[in-house]
Amino acid sequence: MSKSTAEIRQAFLDFFHSKGHQVVSSSTLVPNNDPTLLFTNAGMNQFKDVFLGLDKRAYSRATTSQRCVRAGGKHNDLENVGYTARHHTFFEMLGNFSFGDYFKHDAINFAWELLTSEQWFNLPKEKLWVTVYETDDEAYNIWANEVGVPHERIIRIGDNKGGAFASDNFWQMGDTGPCGPCSEIFFDHGDHIWGGPPGSAEEDGDRYIEIWNIVFMQFNRQSDGTMLPLPKPSVDTGMGLERIAAVLQHVNSNYEIDLFRDLIAAVADVTGATDLSSKSLRVIADHIRSCAFLISDGVIPSNENRGYVLRRIIRRAIRHGNMLGAKETFFYKLVAPLIAVMGPAAAELKQQQAMVEQVLKTEEEQFARTLERGLALLDDELSKLTGDTLDGETAFRLYDTYGFPVDLTADVCRERNLKVDEAGFEQAMEAQRRRARESSGFGADYNSLIRVDSASQFSGYDHVQQHATVTALFRNGEAVDEIHAGEEAVVVLNRTPFYGESGGQVGDKGELKNATATFSVTDTQKYGQAIGHVGILTTGTLRVNHSVEALVDVVRRNRIRLNHSATHLLHAALRNVLGEHVAQKGSLVNDKYLRFDFSHFEAMKPEQIRLVEDLVNEQIRRNMPVQTEVMELDAAKEKGAMALFGEKYDDQVRVLTMGDFSTELCGGTHASRTGDIGLFRILTESGSNLPGCTILRNLAIAGFSAFGSRKLSKRASEPSGRKFEPSVARQRCFSNGP
């Protein structure tokens, strides 16, 4: 009996766990602190800093099942979804990774054992072909001499993309940085399907399908193109779950695996479709996966960047539902079936089900108002065509007036063997695109970040003053041995009481002093495992290995502590008043105020704002102890502390509890008891005015600042009289900025 998709996912993770790999949870679809990516599109994304040497992990082997989206930007499969057997906007990438641990020998043998062993996937060895980079004799010999793959099924692939090292079998992170040859494994579906082996003229056929790519990171590419050997070579592999499921379930299309069969049946049920072979069913089944998980990870339909890609996918699905005869809103009804088929991989989505359904329903209702009129206009324009191309001006008018993304218009044209003048459309969109580029952070130079090999010990939970040693100095981003009076710099210490900005909490300010020098700290940031003190040397000279006294601005730190603890109470109160679907989407905690962004269906009513504020102050009056405990991440989850997407967690996490009201993961500084906060007041509540947007923002103050301040206008005139029973609000602090 064939394994289910869920069983295949688990078997992959179990296999590599048995080989000493740490099983790491999927990261968010919105890349964490990586402005170079629109969406997470590969398993290695969450380990990018590790491969670049900017971050270190407690483990040297890892395995994941990473949720990925390829739509928009450089990696865009959207237009092909529904027309091919293997293109998806959303997929899961199974991967195993070595960070300077094992290399080619083990990576290749692990892959072969998993694929061919009777205990695991038990694929026929004679059905497997492999490719290696043309000059990678080491990998070739391992496949041929150790694994025993016949020479005729090992294919060398050279530079087939027009330049040195430009090859299907040579992977590069960017123009510079880690890179290396790769070895791909293909499955032969048999001669009843057209296609040839990789490297042949018929390689684009469906007979030989790539199922696994094993990347050997062994070089560091320089700006002049030279390749320097990495001191510790690493391994990054990726295998599409849907592809290997198709192979193991003996079907030729990803859309025939058990997961998609169930989803397609659900789509047919909610749309009333009877032809289960319709490509529209495949489109919708694919799109509900990317849309639901993107919304769950905090992306909201909009007209910019990630939000616009999401809107395009939603509207393409709605249009295909229209083609199937759906008369009412249907797309949001697929969230529940999706959760059912995804199983444990949808645990976070299940927690946000109500919000995801509401966002999808609102977006569908909005688009439904213009869909029919837009389609009528498009039909009219296409009927007038004398050639085979719709002009870009009309495509832009459909976008601007009726909300038709250009790929939706192209989809309609494609079904009639017509094209869209996309160059003309882009010309009409030039002003909007320029503004989007100017507001976008994508494409930042990752190599400009300060790199620190050493680590700093943080002592700020218990101390605000600490004797320490300077371990590194940076001026203008470059490492130096000394700095002089008047120079701005970043100072790294071996230990420090200064809190580095993270979790929404700003960095500390203060001074670093010794007998001959004073450094004014205006900010504190994290650089990998090190803590950097940003500021200016006001007197003297400071050198590496100098001793200093690190002095935190205590008054400012205390105000931040109170605001941070109040933020946790606010989150708990929001979940109590509005519902458990509320999830934190961003925060800012400084010495003046706290700002808290969260998900909800609609703007808060005045009486709800009053209830939240009153509930927070009730918890302050209870004067509950604020306690912290360091434990394993899994133990923290069992304790009730929810770890959501968007934050990187170490194996050991800090759990913060406030009586019976709040339990969460947080590395920030806090009050000792809730009563220390004194008073809490909400100043403003706002949200985006984009239709379908459900991210709200509270601006609030706590402590001495709250006394004598004016309350939020437009308040409910009378208390509601609602009585609350304290409940554990499972939450955590995000590092999202403003």
Swiss-Prot record:
Enzyme Commission number(s) from the entry: 6.1.1.7
Free-text function comment from the UniProt entry: Catalyzes the attachment of alanine to tRNA(Ala) in a two-step reaction: alanine is first activated by ATP to form Ala-AMP and then transferred to the acceptor end of tRNA(Ala). Also edits incorrectly charged Ser-tRNA(Ala) and Gly-tRNA(Ala) via its editing domain.
GO cellular component, one term: cytosol
UniProt-listed GO biological process terms: alanyl-tRNA aminoacylation; negative regulation of DNA-templated transcription
InterPro entries: aa-tRNA-synth_II/BPL/LPL, Ala-tRNA-lgiase_IIc, Ala-tRNA-ligase_IIc_anticod-bd, Ala-tRNA-synth_IIc_core, Ala-tRNA-synth_IIc_N, Ala-tRNA_ligase, Ala_tRNA_ligase_euk/bac, Thr/Ala-tRNA-synth_IIc_edit
Recorded catalytic activity of this chain's protein: tRNA(Ala) + L-alanine + ATP = L-alanyl-tRNA(Ala) + AMP + diphosphate
Zinc listed as a keyword: yes
Complexes and interactors: Homotetramer.
Family: Belongs to the class-II aminoacyl-tRNA synthetase family.
Cofactor note: Binds 1 zinc ion per subunit.
Upper classification of the organism: Bacteria, Pseudomonadati, Pseudomonadota, Gammaproteobacteria, Enterobacterales
Molecular functions (GO terms): alanine-tRNA ligase activity; aminoacyl-tRNA deacylase activity; ATP binding; tRNA binding; zinc ion binding
Any Pfam family the entry gives: tRNA-synt_2c
Subcellular location: Cytoplasm
Name under which the protein is recorded: Alanine--tRNA ligase
HAMAP family registered for this protein in UniProt: Ala_tRNA_synth_B
Residues holding Zn(2+): 564, 568, 666, 670
Notes concerning its domains: Consists of two domains; the N-terminal catalytic domain and the editing domain; the C-terminal C-Ala domain is replaced by an unrelated sequence in this strain. The editing domain removes incorrectly charged amino acids.
Keywords annotated in UniProt: Aminoacyl-tRNA synthetase, ATP-binding, Cytoplasm, Ligase, Metal-binding, Nucleotide-binding, Protein biosynthesis, RNA-binding, tRNA-binding, Zinc
Residues spanning the signal sequence: none
Cofactor(s) needed for function: Zn(2+)
